[in-house]
């Protein structure tokens, strides 16, 4: 009985692994096609043929190419926040405001390095999709960014009036202002804009704070600040 149950568990894990591989193949292929051919010129047949999976497999996960596009934005954004969260843990930063500044810095640096990802995310991003990214389970199937954000906040002992609205405001600010700085160096370069952005984020956090404590802006000589050059 125990042997057969053990074999059943192994089979189940293998099945889940195969499903994940197929879904990842669809995601990776769709991303490549959407960013080279464009959404309009890409068909579901293009995606499944290049990914090497059956069309029926595609419909197990997605309704149509617009659905995979939306889920892909969530997936890519979720991966980005997952890596940012890992980086902030590795940096051993415990203060909530510093964690937020660090994560924003990390994400901006990654998007500055990967313009294709920036273009794809920014073209297709809406708060609903972002919320999906926060709630998406990441590599270990246990992590999701929004819960981690709430956990970081709880551990800090700080209190904010509406944590979700605060996060929304910060992300909307970063997304809408940094796009031109990264892609076109307009109105200024990202390097020049960063200090203003961080001060504005601190102002947003102060506005939402119930503790009336001032969030310290990271400076270039702060140990935990990541010195990124745009």
Residue locations for each model-derived region?
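Hydrophobic alpha-helical connector segments
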Residues: 71, 85-113, 167-170
């Amino acid at each position: 009985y125990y042997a057969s149950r053990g074999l059943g568990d192994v089979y189940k894990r293998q099945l889940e692994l195969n499903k994940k591989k197929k879904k990842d193949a669809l995601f990776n292929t769709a991303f490549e096609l959407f960013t080279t051919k464009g959404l309009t010129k890409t068909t579901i047949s293009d995606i499944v043929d290049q990914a090497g999976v059956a069309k029926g497999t595609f419909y197990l996960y997605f309704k149509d190419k617009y659905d995979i596009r939306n889920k892909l934005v969530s997936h890519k954004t979720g991966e980005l926040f997952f890596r940012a969260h890992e980086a902030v843990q590795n940096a051993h930063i415990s203060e909530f405001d510093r964690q937020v500044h660090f994560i924003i810095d990390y994400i901006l640096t990654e998007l500055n390095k990967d313009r294709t990802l920036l273009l794809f995310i920014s073209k297709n991003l809406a708060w609903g999709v972002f919320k999906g990214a926060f709630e998406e389970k990441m590599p270990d199937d246990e992590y999701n960014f929004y819960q981690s954000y709430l956990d970081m906040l709880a551990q800090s002992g700080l209190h904010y009036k509406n944590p979700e609205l605060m996060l929304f405001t910060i992300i909307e600010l970063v997304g809408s202002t940094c796009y031109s700085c990264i892609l076109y160096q307009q109105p200024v370069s990202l390097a020049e804009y960063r200090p203003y952005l961080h001060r504005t984020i601190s102002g947003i956090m102060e506005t939402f704070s119930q503790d009336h404590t001032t969030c310290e802006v990271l400076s270039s000589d702060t140990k935990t600040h990541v010195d990124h050059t745009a």
